Structures are given as C-alpha cells and as structure tokens.
Design a protein with these regions (language model features):
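Active-site-proximal beta-strand/loop segments in catalytic clefts of secreted hydrolases
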Residues: 11, 60-65, 72-75, 122-127, ...
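Carboxylate/His-rich catalytic cores and anion/metal-binding grooves
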Residues: 6, 45-46, 52-82, 87-88
Length: 251
C-alpha cells in the first residue's frame, strides 16, 4: 500500500478561490509513521483490496473534517442550480474549516485531476444536515463535475452518514434519504452503517474497520468483478397498509 497526503491533510490543508494545478504532496511507503494522520477507513480499505487482488494499491488522502460538500464542489455546479445556491448561501462561517463554495475543491481536488485514479471514496454529510433539501442535487452534481474534470466515469462509493442526535427534527434522516436517492447516479454505491453506531451522541463512530470492510466489499464486487461478494443489502421498494399492519417490501 502506498500513500499520498498523510501529512498534507494535517499540515497543508489549503483553500483557493481559483483551481490550482500543483499540490505539495508525495508518494510514501505505508508505515506506522506516515499513516499516523491518514484516514483509518482509507487505510483499511486499501489493505483489504491489496490482500484480495495481490497488487500494489495507492491511496490519496484529501479531506478536511467538518466541511460541507459545497466547498468540495466547483462553483459552476452551485451557481447553475437555484436550490443548491440557496443551501450554499445558508451555510455558516467557521474558523476551523472552510464553507466557501469550491475553496477546498480548487486547492485539494483540482490538482489531483492529473492522477489517473481508479475511483473515489466519500464519507461526508454531517455538515449539510441543515440544508438537506439541497443535498441530492449538490452531491450528484459534484460527482458529475469531478468525473468531467478527470474525463473519466470512475466509480464513486460513499458512506451514508451515521445516526446522531442532532437535536433538530429528522434532519439526519432527511440527509440519509438524500444520500439514498443519490445512489441512482450511475457507477455509484452507498454503504449503510446505521447498525454500527452504539452511541448516537458521538458524531465520530469508532468502528472504522467495519466501515472500510463494507466499502472494500463494494469495490471488490462492483469494480474488481468478485461477484461472490455480497456488497448490497435489501433496498426499500414500497409499503402497504392492511388493517392494523404496516407492510414494507424490499428488493
């Protein structure tokens, strides 16, 4: 397993109001020192892929905890959609992470478009619960924009946000619904982790290995062709009411 960005994402988190071409990062061999600040889910994902396909795996770590999806999305996606624009205008400003549209994309994603990546792992959404109504359009627009920037229809696998006591009526569930609808976008896959959260007062669930296992199963099944691996669970189809019974049907 080879890594890019273990130090970059801690030391050199940067923003820009215009797309950049260069980034201060390099490939390193995976070892305890260099993976200290690397994504745990990303590492465990890469480890399982490496063990399954018996080939080197390169992982690029480009993330910033707490950020809304708007800052990872090119401005044209936001400016062309009134619903997305409304959500972006309602974002609060914070000292610890950017909420300006496209700022993280310009500095931390645009320079990576020169890499011939295989796919993307995405775990985000908690900072968009207040504007859940815009998330489906925002997220699917972002995916399409990234693929356009790479000129490649790569797989995009993401994690549905975990249950958390947000203190605001149903916003977490509504964001999860938006993420579920987003899975209709071609060549995407969503991992559900609602059963992996023993404490809904902790917004950072601790079972990272299990989340990575589900992501790697999805990649192995959908991309690497290992169809014997079951990567998707049942999906809700419809409901009906019969007397005192509420009947759910899944596919």
């Amino acid at each position: 397993v080879r890594l890019v960005g273990s130090e970059m994402c801690i030391r050199d988190r940067s923003t820009s109001n215009t797309p950049q071409e260069n980034i201060d990062a390099k490939w390193v061999v995976c070892n305890p020192k260099d993976m200290l600040h690397f994504s745990a889910i990303g590492y465990f994902f890469g480890e399982k892929i490496n063990q399954s396909i018996h080939a080197p795996v390169g992982l690029i770590n480009s993330n910033w905890g707490g950020t809304p999806a708007e800052t990872w999305t090119p401005n044209e996606v936001i400016d062309e959609n009134p619903v997305i624009k409304k959500g972006a205008d309602e974002l609060g400003q914070f000292d610890w992470w950017p909420s300006n549209t496209a700022y993280a994309y310009n500095a931390m994603i645009a320079p990576l478009t020169k890499f011939n990546i295989t796919g993307v792992l995405w775990y985000q959404g908690e900072s968009n619960t207040d504007t859940y109504y815009a998330y489906e359009s925002l997220f699917t627009g972002m995916i399409k924009a990234w693929r356009k920037a790479w000129n490649k229809d790569f797989p995009f696998y993401y994690v549905q946000i975990a249950p958390y006591a947000y203190g605001r009526y149903n916003v977490g569930a509504l964001l999860r619904e938006a993420q579920t609808k987003s899975a209709q976008t071609t060549n995407t896959g969503m991992v559900v982790i609602s059963d992996l959260v023993p404490d809904t007062t902790n917004i950072h669930p601790t079972l990272k290995l299990e989340v990575a296992d589900r992501l790697s199963n999805m990649a192995l099944s959908k991309y690497y062709g290992k169809k014997e691996i079951i990567a998707d669970g049942p999906k809700f189809d419809q409901y009906s009411i019969e007397k005192d019974n509420f009947i759910l049907q899944f596919t």
